Amino acid sequence: MEDKKLLIYELVEELNKLAYEYYVLDNPSVSDKDYDKKYDKLVELEKETGLVLPYSPTQRVGDVVLSKFDKYTHKGKLWSLGKAQSLKEVEDWHNKNVKAVNEYNLTHDDKLPPIKYIITKKFDGLTINCTYNEDGILVTAATRGTGEIGEEITAQAKTIKTIPLKIDNDAVIEVHGEAIMTKEAFEEYNKVAVVPLKNLRNGAAGALRNLNVKETARRNLSAFFYDIGYNEGTPFKTYGEMLKFIKDHGIPMDDYAMECSTIEEIEKEINYIEEIRNKLNYDIDGAVIAVDDMKTRELLGYTVKFPKWALAYKFEAQEATTKLLEVEWNVGRSGRVTPTAILEPVEIGGVTVKRATLNNMDDIERKGVKLGSTVFLRRSNDVIPEIMGVVEESLEGSKDIEAPTTCPYCGSEIVQEGVHYFCENTLSCKPQLVKSIVHFGSREAMNIAGFSEKTAEQLFEELEIKSISDLYRIKKEDLLKLNRFGEKKAQNLIDAIESSKECDLPSFIYALGIPNVGKKTSTDLCKKFKTLDNLKKAKFEELVSVEDIGDIVAQSVLDFFNDETILKSIDELLSLGVTPKFKEEEIKENIFNGKTVVVTGSLSSFSRNEIKEKLQSLGAKVAGSVSKKTDYVLVGKDPGSKYEKALQLNIKIISEEDFKNMIG
């Protein structure tokens, strides 16, 4: 029995270490299968011996439903922060700090160091306080509450897999942090939620203040820690020392923490954080500027509400509420009919927003959105904002949104497939045809120079170009009859259409617009099947054998090439002189062949598509996210969170200049 108990201690220590590698470092040293095997063994031993350590990974998720939240008195106060919304306010605060230090040093022998700050991101989540006892065991987690008294949420916090249940420390400490919901976790939760979450912050706060711990676990929260508010161990001399302690003890901490001494340096870092804000996988709403030296903090002191030695610089909100006026239904290239919300104009992040995304009728019903109601809006990554939910109090007098029964453009009957609506009139529905023709002629497809959506609409309206093959029947004299078409422009378009006939097979496959098939998948298919005929005859088993192609894409390809109308259209293109060929490129031995590369930031010599094509021509796989499988991260100007992740995982980082030198 003693041997089994000893094994429990060993397994708990090992599993906690492996969990830290997996959830915090994102760099697992064992497979999921090996981890599960060890975990199952621990569960078996705990049942057999009755010994369950308080920091065992088996204690993270329980089926418990609590009856109430107990009050918890914090050992150290959780202060609010003073706020600034302009750089002038930050400068005034900085000047006061410098003046206070200079005045102190004039009259004291124990001089204070020159003012230095550490800037960190201001996370937009729920503040939590985790207490570790003298054995390093997590004994309590609590909300901020009043700053002095919060609510105990220990069971809920234990569901956050990045929070260690035990650390190597022999003094009681309280660690302050922010529980957050990542954008990825938010999207995954909302896919299956009966009532979708409205924003990430509410997602995190609602999870931790839920008495049903199982529901907390479903939201898959994360956490970042940034302060030790109570410490019975050796005092810290600087904030930098404190942050190093947090990181060294395996407590999750954001990697971004920059030292600054001047207002110019502070401004530079604030601007940087604001630039990368939308690229992050979680929400931030500002930057925190805190004095580094602890003795200087003592000198500066506190007001009744907040410390004078720290300041929060607040960014403009990325969320707002406004009134939904009407819904406009649009038809895409595939015939899908999708709703767009027309809104009462509102400012979000310095931009006036008048339209927002409504994905489909199912999405509208789940969110409870109605005409005339007030809705929550969220804008991220400079794309069209999305409606996240409705203000319940605004529903009185609102009207239901009704799905159209006929196409808003051609009047054809609409059919429903799953949660989506489609116009099946592929022969004469203007938006479908125009967008299909534009896609066909785009740079990554047939590369017909100077061919815009405006031109496609004009050809549709005035020359009755109703199919892709009609493009190759256009004559110069036809174009000369049109508005805005002079001799030169007409000849240029005819030449561009003619030169597009000699094309490579991957571009042609991509141009055809097979559902779920992008440029990379088109290239992968061509590498496997070599010719158009081979691809048309491909079986399901052959398609799924291609790397990165799953059941859905394989079925899309099968369905596409089993459609007689599509096959007839392809034959027409071939008869008109379009000759797609696959060139098997021999890749010369180079440093990138067979490597996985991630690109972040903007490059001066390459567009995003150009660098992707260049890397692929060298035999590299271009990935969209950084992981332990990444070999290189190519960093341009203003890199995003991928750069930070690469530093964390110790992945080789190369500049644009390095890249050019490496390929010769």
From Swiss-Prot:
The keyword Zinc applies. GO terms for cellular component: cytosol. Zn(2+) binds at residues 407, 410, 423, 429. SMART domains: BRCT (SM00292), HhH1 (SM00278), LIGANc (SM00532). One of its GO terms (biological process) is DNA repair. The keyword Lipid biosynthesis does not apply. Residues 587-664 form the BRCT domain. It catalyses: NAD(+) + (deoxyribonucleotide)n-3'-hydroxyl + 5'-phospho-(deoxyribonucleotide)m = (deoxyribonucleotide)n+m + AMP + beta-nicotinamide D-nucleotide. Its cofactor is Mg(2+); Mn(2+). NAD(+) binds at residues 32-36, 80-81, 144, 178, 314. It is an enzyme of class 6 (ligase). The active site is at 122 (n6-amp-lysine intermediate). InterPro entries: BRCT_dom (IPR001357), BRCT_dom_sf (IPR036420), DisA/LigA_HHH (IPR041663), DNA_ligase (IPR001679), DNA_ligase_CS (IPR033136), DNAligase_adenylation (IPR013839), DNAligase_N (IPR013840), Hlx-hairpin-Hlx_DNA-bd_motif (IPR003583). Its EC number is 6.5.1.2. Keywords: DNA damage, DNA repair, DNA replication, Ligase, Magnesium, Manganese, Metal-binding, NAD, Zinc. One of its GO terms (molecular function) is metal ion binding. PANTHER family: CHROMOSOME TRANSMISSION FIDELITY FACTOR 18, DNA LIGASE. Belongs to the NAD-dependent DNA ligase family. LigA subfamily. DNA ligase that catalyzes the formation of phosphodiester linkages between 5'-phosphoryl and 3'-hydroxyl groups in double-stranded DNA using NAD as a coenzyme and as the energy source for the reaction. It is essential for DNA replication and repair of damaged DNA. This is DNA ligase. It comes from Clostridium novyi (strain NT).
